[in-house]
Amino acid sequence: MWGCDMLPFRVLVGKGREIMKRQKGPRTKASRERWSSPYVDVAENRWFSPGVRFVTEQNWMRPVGSRRFCSCGVMDKRAFHAVLRRAFRGACGTEEELFPREYEEQFRLEGSMTRQDMAVMLFRCTERMGIDTTVRGNLAAYSDASEVSAYAQPAMSWAVGTGLLRGIRSGSASILSPWGGTTRAQADTVLLRWCTWAGQPEARELLGVK
């Protein structure tokens, strides 16, 4: 199943009246069927297994070496941008289109990806696809909200409001950890959440969302 080039939906860019539409062609099997992991380092019952399964079946993220997903491997920004372009058939734009000149001093695609980096990339990509990004969450509910970079605050607020990013327990507090690194497992989980939020049928079925 994995390794074939398939995308069972397409994102329609425009005014956002119709966000996603089914394409003809191959689609995944019923998402609630038991999944047999093709990876030697991913068990079916791990917290990140649904995300790994989803990005594998969509051919968005690929194995590292022979049958290894490397779920704990750190995701870098350029690799995540490539995943977004693969997922949305280039609708999120090139590096220059996604991050115009005003972002140059604040955001570069070089280096490993933090949680706020991931939020910014998904936020910009979602905006470019004509999908409503006005929802906002309350960053002040997190004890480290002041650590979020100014340019990343709209994206982080949106990611919290949509449920893409969730708080991390740190003692008695809940933190955002905006400067924390992002693993491949975390990235694929957020992609699954994004597709569920946007109404992608397989993603919603996999998470049991009606």
Residue locations for each model-derived region?
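Feature responds to low-complexity, polar/acidic, surface-exposed segments characteristic
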Residues: 9-49, 57-117, 124-153, 166-184, ...
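Short, charged, amphipathic alpha-helices and their helix-cap/turn boundaries
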Residues: 162-164
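Short, aromatic- and glycine-rich surface loops/edge beta-strands on solvent-exposed regions
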Residues: 1
